[in-house]
């Protein structure tokens, strides 16, 4: 008569549960040893009892085998599912951007006083506060630009006034200089016409004319020469 099939479920009796644990643990450790020897496999086995006691077996080292396992899992996840991870990342980013765009569009409509029916009292109050702060900053910036423009125009006005005074002084100085030149005795020589000179004798041509009539002063000057 064959052995009956044992139902796999938690053993309620504490003593029976402990006895079964010891038997199966020893059998599991034996099979792990046989697997490592017969198949030249790297085997690591870790078992914790219900009381928290540790039982382990490794033909190499439990820590070394665990590190090897973690490395293999990391490499496979980095190489095997890169495209899948990238696709998932871009989908998440696209979804995030769509939400941001939708929120910005809703905020713009709220600022323009549209689609306010979807807001409650608290949200309307927050929107009002944000608008008041925004208007305050806009007015402050506008006044800042206005004061800067006024200051620039005042400086420009002073520069133009200084330039005007300088030009007036130059004109007055030129007029005084012209008046002084008109009063100088040497101005009578300006009415004497220029006469041509002989290139050899360096004398006016009319002085070389024998028919030229000299004044007494001129004759005396010629005699002295």
Curated annotation (Swiss-Prot):
<keyword id="KW-0539">Nucleus</keyword>
<dbReference type="InterPro" id="IPR033896">
    <property type="entry name" value="MEF2-like_N"/>
</dbReference>
<dbReference type="InterPro" id="IPR036879">
    <property type="entry name" value="TF_MADSbox_sf"/>
</dbReference>
<comment type="function">
    <text>Probable transcription factor involved in flower development.</text>
</comment>
<protein>
    <recommendedName>
        <fullName>Agamous-like MADS-box protein MADS1</fullName>
    </recommendedName>
</protein>
<dbReference type="Pfam" id="PF00319">
    <property type="entry name" value="SRF-TF"/>
</dbReference>
<keyword id="KW-0804">Transcription</keyword>
<dbReference type="GO" id="GO:0009908">
    <property type="term" value="P:flower development"/>
</dbReference>
<dbReference type="InterPro" id="IPR002100">
    <property type="entry name" value="TF_MADSbox"/>
</dbReference>
<dbReference type="GO" id="GO:0005634">
    <property type="term" value="C:nucleus"/>
</dbReference>
<keyword id="KW-0238">DNA-binding</keyword>
<dbReference type="Pfam" id="PF01486">
    <property type="entry name" value="K-box"/>
</dbReference>
<dbReference type="GO" id="GO:0000981">
    <property type="term" value="F:DNA-binding transcription factor activity, RNA polymerase II-specific"/>
</dbReference>
<dbReference type="GO" id="GO:0006357">
    <property type="term" value="P:regulation of transcription by RNA polymerase II"/>
</dbReference>
<dbReference type="GO" id="GO:0046983">
    <property type="term" value="F:protein dimerization activity"/>
</dbReference>
<dbReference type="InterPro" id="IPR002487">
    <property type="entry name" value="TF_Kbox"/>
</dbReference>
<dbReference type="GO" id="GO:0000978">
    <property type="term" value="F:RNA polymerase II cis-regulatory region sequence-specific DNA binding"/>
</dbReference>
<keyword id="KW-0805">Transcription regulation</keyword>
<dbReference type="GO" id="GO:0045944">
    <property type="term" value="P:positive regulation of transcription by RNA polymerase II"/>
</dbReference>
<keyword id="KW-0287">Flowering</keyword>
<dbReference type="InterPro" id="IPR050142">
    <property type="entry name" value="MADS-box/MEF2_TF"/>
</dbReference>
């Amino acid at each position: 008569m064959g052995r009956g099939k044992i139902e796999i479920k938690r053993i309620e009796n504490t003593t029976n549960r402990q006895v079964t644990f010891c038997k199966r643990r020893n059998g599991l450790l034996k099979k792990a040893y046989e697997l490592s020897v017969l198949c030249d496999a790297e085997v690591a086995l870790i078992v914790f009892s219900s009381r928290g006691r540790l039982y382990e077996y490794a033909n190499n080292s439990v820590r070394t085998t665990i590190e090897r396992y973690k490395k293999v899992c990391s490499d496979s996840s980095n190489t095997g599912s890169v495209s899948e991870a990238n696709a998932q990342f871009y989908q998440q980013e696209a979804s995030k951007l769509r939400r941001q765009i939708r929120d910005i569009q809703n905020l713009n409509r709220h600022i323009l006083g549209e689609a306010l029916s979807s807001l409650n009292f608290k949200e309307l109050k927050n929107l009002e506060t944000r608008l008041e702060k925004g208007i305050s900053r806009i007015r402050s910036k506008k006044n800042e630009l206005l004061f800067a423009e006024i200051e620039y125009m005042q400086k420009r006005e002073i520069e133009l006034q200084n330039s005007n005074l300088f030009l007036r002084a130059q004109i007055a100085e030129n007029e005084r200089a012209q008046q002084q030149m008109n009063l100088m005795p040497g101005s009578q020589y300006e009415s004497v016409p220029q006469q041509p000179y002989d290139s050899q004798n360096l004398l006016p041509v009319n002085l070389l004319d024998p028919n030229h009539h000299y004044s007494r002063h001129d004759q005396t000057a010629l005699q002295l020469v």
